[in-house]
Amino acid sequence: MTTAQAVGAVSSEATQWYAIDWPTINRNVRRLQVRIAQATKEGSWGKVRALQRLLTHSYSGKVLAVRRVTENTGKKTPGVDQEIWNTPEKKVQAVQALKRRGYQPQPLRRVYIPKSDGKTMRPLGIPTMKDRAQQALYLLALDPVVETTADKNSYGFRPQRSCADAIEQCFLALKSAKTAWILEGDIKSCFDRISHNWLLAHVPMDRAILQKWLKSGYMEKHVFHETTDGTPQGGIISPALSNCALDGLERLLKEKYPTGTRLRSLGGKYPSVNLIRYADDFVITGKTKELLEGEIKPLVEQFLRARGLELSPTKTIVTHVTQGFDFLGQNVRRYSNGKLLIKPSKKSVKHFLAGIRETIKAALGKSATDLINELNPKIRGWANYHRHVVSKRMFNRVDYSIFYKLWQWARRRHPNKDPRWLKQKYFERHRGRDWFFFGETWDEEGQPTKVRMLLASRIPIKRHVKVRSEANPYDPVYETYFEKREENHMLDTFRGTRTLRFLWYEQCGLCPACNTKITRITGWRLHHCVPRVMGGSRSVENRVLLHPECHNRVHDQRIAVSKPRLPSGGVRRA
């Protein structure tokens, strides 16, 4: 054993991984993605294929793909080979092994997870780490094409888009009293039935690689099963493939029913046809029930049939907006006073409270602090999801239901104690509100402190600003737009506000472009020194605050802005 080995010296491969210049890697990949998007926009498909090949064979692309699969939530979940890449040495070896020639994917490992109803199970196919990295690599080259050609109002599994955008588009499409009917579309086993032949003929990527993935099969209980159709849920590239299959439906409807064109069949009225899709869930608005059932539904069925898909006859229904419908966990309905309101759906509330009850029921032997630490992330996640709609009354009901279950938990935990003792032990008055559930713990310095239950009703309700339907994160034209959205998102979160304050202190309150004060009156804009479309990171090392006018000038004149020098004595974190 050498001296270096004895003291645990870092290997050459580990040194190689730690020495990677990630800003340069991101910049190289982003530049190619921007060029791919531009070539797609121009319809230069030969150039698209050449640039995709350049990206999938590049060192930067391979390194970024390996980093993605070793840093995401599934990094500790192995495939059929039971291998995970948890050391720098394995990551470097993985980069070197990512080659097209001789590549043969292994079967997927089939597992089952419960669906939202809690009764049925959803199959997932888990690829090996190598296959995941290969998919991540080819997704880097496919995603700019998919984003450029995607339907404008498709919101699922796309960068810079969310469920909140889809819900807000529902409101925009239905707020007019002229739009009264909705087709609720449900595609039967969408991911499991997409035609392989259609995907191979239409997905703009290396077809030989795609065919190997589609035909790789899966292992279940040590038995190999072939796959003849569908894209496995669990693969990194699967959401992009399903979006490829379903994109085009909105364009088809717009060609058939152009905006601003009256229909004779409707007595010269506008059809008011709009599609809002999130993955395989979609709704289509229309003027009349007859239009949706007699014309649009057959058109959708024909579109899906070519892709090996079909609508579920029992779950695909036409509903009047006054009856309301559920979409992505929200209920959309126009009430008798003419107002269109979106609220958390009863199903979503019931499912959430059932999970809370199970957590509390299983925590009889835990302390109040441990229980709060389990419940708070669940409450925060559910409330943040619904905080963009009319949720205040439902949040209060949820708070009461949780309080009632916590009181039962306290009584079961201390059956011989009277209610006054229980209240003093677990509940207190805080911020003007009584009966705040709390637990006692110690901070890092060993001092006693309290943790408190999060109340859903304390989450502020704020209207979501929908992303522009045509905005493309791979198009430099929208760089300023996405910077502004990110700034608004930061201001909307406690952590983000701290970051803005830190940047302000770091710059001594000065704009680096004009060297004058940034104040609330002057306003500010968040700027990336290295643009995001060129691979710049979101870290504070790549961000500065500029005046709005200075920000416009920097982008218009393409002026380079660098980070200001730190003030003497460093920067205090806000």
Across the structure, where does each feature detected by a protein language model lie?
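Charged boundary/loop elements
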Residues: 15-74, 140-156, 563
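Conserved polymerase palm-domain catalytic core
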Residues: 97, 149-153, 158-161, 165-324
